[in-house]
Each structure stands twice: as C-alpha cells, then as structure tokens.
C-alpha cells in the first residue's frame, strides 16, 4: 500500500485491527499481527524485550530469525529504551513472525534500518509469504515493486 502522508494508509490498518470502527460495512480478520513504524510505541518500557515476546508468541524457530535479522540473543534481555531504533524494530518484526499470524500488517517496517539490514529483513519476510498474507505500507515505491504481488495506491 503506497500513498502520500495523510492519505489513510495507517488508518486502514487501524480498521483491520479493529482499533477503529468502520462507518459502513464490516471488517473481520483473525490471527493478525502488526509491525508499527515506531517500534517504541509497541513495547512496554519497563519489561525486557524477551518477556514481551514470550507474552504473545512461542519462541520456536527464534534462532534462525535472530541470525537473519542480525540480532544477538543478549539484546532481547534488555529494556526497549536500551536498544537502538533499528534493533528494536527488528525485535518487533521478530515478535510478529513468532506469533505465526495469518495476516501480517507492516507499517513502514524497515524505515529505521540501514539499507543492507533492510534488504536482509525484507528477504527474510519474503521467505514467509507462503505461510501468511502480508500488507505492507511504504513510501518506497521500489520496495513495493520488488516485494509485492499487487500495489494499492491510496490518495
């Protein structure tokens, strides 16, 4: 999903998640996970990252994800504010994948990552396309063309 700022891309995700009520019609989605643009908004500041992952997901398969996303397991023992934005965003993606959702919503998930890590993370996400559907919000049209089956332009 691409479009200018303020076009309603994130609002669409809020509707899908049920955080906003549709004025007409209904939206019904089960087993959905989301990676927000700002990773600090999705982690409680007083609990370690690993505890917040364990609260919502199984840790099965975590080692391979850690390697792909260039994350050290020791980072997961830290509090969110002790990590860089890029590290915490990768932890957010890790948590979402470990939830094994049917639908993964990605709101600018790699905007805080350097180009090399961004490519690694997107390639890793692409490996899981057969396991789940993904909706990606991005301002980067080249990224959308590279990874999407379909592109929806809003605005």
Enumerate the language-model features and the residues they cover.
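A short, proline-enriched helix->beta-strand linker immediately N-terminal to the Walker B motif
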Residues: 98-102
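Hydrophobic anchor residue at the start of the ABC signature
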Residues: 93, 121
């Amino acid at each position: 999903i691409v479009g200018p700022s303020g076009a309603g891309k994130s609002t669409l995700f809020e509707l899908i998640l049920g955080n906003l009520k549709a004025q007409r019609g209904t939206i019904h989605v089960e087993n959905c996970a989301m990676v927000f643009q700002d990773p600090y908004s999705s982690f409680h500041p007083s609990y370690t990252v690993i505890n917040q992952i364990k609260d919502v997901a199984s840790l099965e398969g975590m080692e391979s994800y850690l390697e792909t996303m260039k994350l050290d397991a020791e980072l997961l023992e830290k509090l969110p504010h002790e990590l860089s934005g890029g590290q915490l965003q990768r932890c957010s993606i890790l948590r979402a994948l470990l939830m094994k959702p049917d639908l993964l919503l990605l709101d600018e998930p790699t905007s805080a990552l350097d180009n090399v890590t961004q490519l690694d993370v997107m390639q890793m996400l692409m490996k899981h396309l057969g396991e789940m559907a993904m909706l990606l919000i991005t301002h980067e049209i080249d990224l959308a063309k590279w990874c999407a089956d379909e592109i929806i332009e809003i605005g």
